[in-house]
């Protein structure tokens, strides 16, 4: 068989993901960056595998932007598959609970 200096983990973890900070870039129609707004990680974060967050929604009056995120610290594992507090699923392999959150950002950047 020989020797190998590599290490492999073949155990599948379908709920794995890690949270990270959220940054909103404002760009012109030609693609030039205007500015970047960092969403405070003390409020919310995003999670790598989730497909239900960060869909940007503009209000009908064009004055606010909303999106869904997680009320969890950055660099936390398995948040997007965690239970919601007070709604526990005993079949969920993730043992933690985190709230989902809706973030509203005003045109001036206020959160």
Model-identified regions with their sequence ranges:
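Beta-propeller blade signature
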Residues: 20-29, 86-108
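Short, conserved, GDST-rich strand-edge loop motifs in beta-rich repeat architectures
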Residues: 1-16, 68-96
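Signature of short aromatic-glycine-proline-rich micro-motifs recurring in repeat-based ectodomains
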Residues: 19-23, 42-73, 97-101
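Beta-propeller domains
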Residues: 2-42
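Surface-exposed loop and turn segments in beta-propeller and other repeat-based domains
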Residues: 32-49, 107-111
